[in-house]
Structures are given as structure tokens and as C-alpha cells.
Amino acid sequence: MKRDFRALLNPALERIEAYKVEGGQDAEVKLNQNESPFDLPMWLKDKILDEFRREPWNRYPDILPYRGMATYASFLGVPAESVIMSNGSNEMLYTIFMACVGAGRKVLIPEPSFSLYDKLAVLLQGEIVSVPLNPDLSFDVDAIIAAAEREKVDFIVLSTPNNPAGKSMSHDEVERIVSTCDAIVLADEAYIEFSQQESVVDLIDRYPNLIVLRTMSKALALAGMRIGFAITNPELMAEITKPKIPFASGRLAEITLANVLENYSLVTDAVHYILAERQRMEQELAGIAGVEVFESDTNFLIIRVGNAKEVFTKLREGGVLVRNVSGYPLMQNCLRCNIGLIEENDRLLELLKSC
């Protein structure tokens, strides 16, 4: 008699679940996935598509998207061999984790953090060392360093600015961790364009154990294009490239990236709008009874309410979709809402006042 197919699978699958988005992905006012509220203008889309039409669709793209990598390297002011492009930063996370994590390897993750970190560590049979954030959801840098040294961790993942908590480490704090800890450090800078803190990309040549992760899904408004990057020194890059899926990024992504970077004022204008709205929303939310708002360094806000499940449902019924993040450590009865257009934010405020 044959074994049940489950007995033939990776046993780690019993400890993880498929990714899902509570409430779906469609709503009149969609504020649940930290996307930009601004799509690319039609004139730029037309220009991108005109270029893509001239590409051969019957041929594979490059093994790695070398033209996109060179474009982004030039934008950052780093050598092309220090950059690798992926089909979204999630794919890059899979690649980096496969290169850095294995059975028995210790992975330090401040909690709460992006849920995919834990999932990948478990899937690759790593041992997670959790370090809680402070009660105000800021990083406890001393605790991170102490745990890394005590547990002799191999890999440290820092979401800074943090998703879902919304706060950042300073440039000096990240450098302190990288310089002190005997581990590879991944700094996930998905929200860096919204942050008051400086990127640590400038440290990649100084520290051979640092990797920086970037996404084009947030500030650059390209979530539908799936474009991510890792930046590190060439020696480490040669190693993390080994498990990378070949042909994963097509020419459309490369062409889109080049055109958006050539018209970067679209990004800076959108970021200024979002930051101004974030400041207004912080003030407005602070005036609503029963709502506690946390300081943010991203394009989203964390609020604590009396009953997150009930408020989430009432907002959903009112046409506004946010993210219930109550399941994360330290975030009981918390909701996450990204900054939308003025009218979308006003709709959220109106509903919260009636909850």
C-alpha cells in the first residue's frame, strides 16, 4: 500500500500556511497592501508599451535581467556587479534565504516583522531567534545584538522601515549591528523612500556581510510589475546568485523600470503627497475617541482600536479595506492602513468616527 502523499512532502509544510489576504483584494477604497494610490500616467504606459512591442516575444529574456540591473545600479551609484534584479522582492527573499539558511542555521528576526521571513526560515529548516520590538514598536538594538551574540546566529533580517510596525532603525544602528554581529545581515528597505532615515546601501563595500533589499512596489508604484533588487558586494553577490531562478524577469519589467527612473519626479511628487497626507492622518486619527495611532516612518499607519475584528468588518462593510494585524506580537487590536488619496483617507476617517 502506498503512503499518503503528505508523508512524501517537506515536513516543514505542516508548520506553514499559504499566503492569503484577509478581506480579499478588491474594495472601493483599498488601503490594505501598502500600495501607491498613484498609477503611472497613460502617456508613460504608452511609451513603455511602444518599446515593448518591438521586443521579440518568442525569445527568452536574458538569464538575469542585466539591463535592468545596470539601470538600477547607475541610479544608485553602485557597480552593476553589486546589483541583482528579481521578479518582485519576495522572489529575491526566497533566493537570499536559500543561499543563507539551511537545517540548523539560526535566523534572528525582530518581531513583529514581515511574515514571509518566518515562513522561509521554517521552510528551509532554520531555527528562528525572535527578538521583540519595544512596546512602542521601535527596535531594541541592544537586545538584537545581545541575542545575536548569545545564540551565535548565522543570519539577521531587519525590516527597516519595519512592516508591519512602521518604525525604522537609524543608519548608525544598522551599521552597529552589521559591524558587531558575526552574521550575514539583510536590511529590507522596502519603504526607504518614505523614511527620514538614510539607506545603508553606502555600506555594502565596507561590510562584506551586508545585503540590502529593495522593491519597486511601494514608492515607485510598480506592484503589478513585480520588480525587486538585492544590493551587496560582488563576492557575496556571486554566492546568492547561485540559487536564483533563471529567466524570471522579462523585458517589460526592465523597460518599465528604465522609464520610471527617467521620470523620477513622478515618484518624488507622489512621496511628498503621501507624507503630507500621513501627517494629516496622524493628527486626525489622534482626535478620534478610542483610536491610538502609532508614529510611522512609512506610507502606512498603525492604529489600535477597542476591537480590531469588529472595526475591520465595519470598515469592510463601508467599502474600506484595511489590514487586521492583530495576530502579530505586540499588535493586539491593531489595524494597518496605507495612505491613499485625500478622498480615500477621508472616507476611512468618517467610518472610524462612527465605529
UniProtKB/Swiss-Prot annotation:
Its cofactor is pyridoxal 5'-phosphate. The keyword Aminoacyl-tRNA synthetase does not apply. InterPro entries: Aminotrans_II_pyridoxalP_BS, Aminotransferase_I/II_large, HisP_aminotrans, HistidinolP_aminotransfase, PyrdxlP-dep_Trfase, PyrdxlP-dep_Trfase_major, PyrdxlP-dep_Trfase_small. It catalyses: L-histidinol phosphate + 2-oxoglutarate = 3-(imidazol-4-yl)-2-oxopropyl phosphate + L-glutamate. One of its GO terms (molecular function) is pyridoxal phosphate binding. It is an enzyme of class 2 (transferase). SUPFAM superfamilies: PLP-dependent transferases. Keywords: Amino-acid biosynthesis, Aminotransferase, Histidine biosynthesis, Pyridoxal phosphate, Transferase. The modification N6-(pyridoxal phosphate)lysine is found at residue 218. This is Histidinol-phosphate aminotransferase. It comes from Chlorobaculum parvum (strain DSM 263 / NCIMB 8327). The gene is hisC.
